[in-house]
C-alpha cells in the first residue's frame, strides 16, 4: 500500500505518519529526513541540495525526485510506504507518476490557518537538551525555563508567527492544488485535523478502512 500524506506545515502530518507506519508496518519516507541523510552522507545530490538549503531556496525538483527515487528503490519500501513532504507541487506529482510509482490513497489533514499559527507559534524549545514545550498544551513548570535542564527556552525562527504565515502562503500557492489533482484521480481522502492528537489519529485510521496491515517483520 503506497500512501501520500498531505497537509499544511504544522497540520500534524509527521505524527500521523508515525501512527500509520506502526499500524500498517510500512516505512515513512519523509522528504526532510532523506534530504538530511543525503547531506550527511555527502552524496552528489546531497551537495546540490545543500546549496539551495543554505541560501533559503527550495531544493529543485530534479534533486528531490532523484533522492526520492533512490529511497523508494530500497527493500523496505517494496511492500508499501508513506510519503510525507512529497510531492509538494503539481510538477512533482506528475514526476512521481512518470516514475511508475502507483499511489493507492492520499490522505489530506485539513487544519485552519489560524489554528496552525496558534499551534506552531506556541512552541518553545530548550537549546540545551532539546525538550519541547507549548504555551497552551505543554507548559514548563516554571515559565520560560526547561523542566529537565533549567536552560532558558527559546522560540525557533521557523515558529515565529510571521514565518508561519509565509510558509502557509507558499503552501496555499504551491501544494494545496494537489488536493484537486488527487481528487480528480479518485484517491483523495479528507481528514479534519482536531485539537487533540488522539482524535485526529482516530479519523486518520478510519481513512485507512479496508487496508489490511502487513505482517510485522
Predicted segments with their positions:
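Glycine-rich phosphate-binding loop of ATP-dependent small-molecule kinases
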Residues: 1-217
Amino acid at each position: 500500500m503506497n500512501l501520500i500524506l498531505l497537509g499544511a506545515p504544522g497540520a500534524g502530518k509527521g505524527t500521523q505518519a508515525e501512527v500509520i507506519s506502526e499500524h500498517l508496518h510500512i516505512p515513512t519516507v519523509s522528504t526532510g529526513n532523506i534530504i538530511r541523510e543525503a547531506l550527511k552522507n555527502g552524496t552528489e545530490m546531497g551537495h546540490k541540495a545543500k546549496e539551495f538549503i543554505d541560501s533559503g531556496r527550495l531544493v529543485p525538483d530534479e534533486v528531490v525526485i532523484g533522492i526520492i527515487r533512490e529511497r523508494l528503490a530500497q527493500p523496505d519500501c517494496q511492500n508499501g510506504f508513506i510519503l510525507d513532504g512529497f510531492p509538494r507541487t503539481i510538477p512533482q506529482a506528475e514526476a512521481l507518476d512518470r516514475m511508475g510509482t502507483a499511489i493507492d490513497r492520499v490522505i489530506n489533514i485539513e487544519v485552519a490557518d489560524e489554528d496552525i499559527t496558534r499551534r506552531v507559534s506556541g512552541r518553545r524549545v530548550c537549546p540545551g537538551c532539546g525538550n519541547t514545550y507549548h504555551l497552551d498544551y505543554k507548559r514548563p513548570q516554571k515559565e520560560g525555563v526547561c523542566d529537565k535542564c533549567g536552560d532558558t527556552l527559546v522560540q525557533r525562527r521557523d515558529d515565529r508567527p510571521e514565518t508561519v504565515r509565509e510558509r502557509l502562503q507558499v503552501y496555499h500557492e504551491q501544494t494545496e492544488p494537489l488536493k484537486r489533482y488527487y481528487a480528480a484521480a479518485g484517491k483523495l481522502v479528507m481528514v479534519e485535523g482536531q485539537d487533540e492528537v488522539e482524535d485526529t489519529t482516530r479519523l486518520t485510521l478510519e481513512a485507512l478502512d479496508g487496508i489490511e496491515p502487513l505482517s510485522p517483520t
